[in-house]
Amino acid sequence: MFLKQVWLEQYRNIQKACIQPARHLTVLYGRNGQGKTNFLESLYLLGNARPFRAAKVPDLISHGSRSAAVRGLVLAAGVESTIVLHVENSTRRVTIDDKAVHRAADLHGKLAVVVFSPDDTAMVKLGPETRRRYLDRSLYASDAAFLSDYHTYYRILKQRNALLKTNQQAGLDLWTEQLATAGIRLMQHRQHYTSRLNQLLQQKYQQIAGEQEKVSVVYQPDVICTAEENGTELLLNVFRNQHEQDLRYKSTGRGPHRDDLLFSIGDRPLKSFGSQGQQRSFVLALKMAELDHLQETFGEMPLLLLDDIASELDRERMTNLLSYVRQREVQVLITTTDVTPFLPVLQQDSKLFRVEEGRLTYEGNGTP
């Protein structure tokens, strides 16, 4: 996949911008708060119709403006298409070649994007909800069917919890049965995806960190039943056994909405035994595993966004990373406050932009 051109208007603090990213490496540099991350966020939006940072839709619109727009010219599977995201008030509208997109699944494969930001490393030490969010977001990028099963499960969960809160027993059994059926489908998606990520992870970690330490990512379901033929019945029995407790606490206490991921290094929990550098390398290796999995899915590499990467990696790890993505011919956009560490890796096919107060200024390829 290749993002040939991107155009923004009234997006956050960027009033207007139009650039043609380099085929391989584009570096955007400038002080904090100038709009670098906003620009990367807009690219993620094109591929996913939602930002990678927590944000309300109106927050995406420049102060004092009524709407915002992002347009990208994308080459995927040998076909060139124009994706437009238009934001107005609290609504988002997406078109592909002037045809309205009504389902998120219709965007699938048009512009696959993997993003790494400083916030991602925090999921190593934060609670299970953060890791579930990461898992589900990355899973959706490679599996369009997942989104439907995800929404089905959480819609049923919401309805069941509503009955529990009002102590309505009528209909609860039916919703519980539906929750078990939907839950198993969700768990199977997560199990299969995590297993493949784990197969890819070790090599990526060694390439980035330059270490031979064994690393792994393992799916930890709240209820262990995904490998059984009668998994739905097993999950249903757990829900039934929890019935009285759920009524007492007015919420569904067990199930896939309590799942987690276990990150390990040297067969020990990463959050307790991994250094800060190892934790950062682990998460970045996880992102590289995502890249490979998306290539397996779509037959071509996705777009890679690296936000403030210089603050997360030392010089050796960053050199290893950039060497790896160049070998794989990945299109990469990087933001940084200090361009100096990147000057040695900039080549004739690179592009350098200075970002200041929402304005992007092209400064050549950064080579002497």
From Swiss-Prot:
GO terms for biological process: DNA replication; DNA synthesis involved in DNA repair; double-strand break repair; SOS response. It is found in: Cytoplasm. Transmembrane segments: none annotated. It holds the Pfam family SMC_N. GO terms for molecular function: ATP binding; single-stranded DNA binding. Keywords: ATP-binding, Cytoplasm, DNA damage, DNA repair, DNA replication, DNA-binding, Nucleotide-binding, SOS response. Gene3D superfamilies: P-loop containing nucleotide triphosphate hydrolases, RecF/RecN/SMC, N-terminal domain. Its main location: cytoplasm. PROSITE patterns: RECF_2. ATP binds at residues 30-37. Signal peptide: none annotated. GO terms for cellular component: cytoplasm. Belongs to the RecF family. PANTHER family: DNA REPLICATION AND REPAIR PROTEIN RECF. HAMAP family: RecF. The RecF protein is involved in DNA metabolism; it is required for DNA replication and normal SOS inducibility. RecF binds preferentially to single-stranded, linear DNA. It also seems to bind ATP. NCBIfam families: recf. This is DNA replication and repair protein RecF.
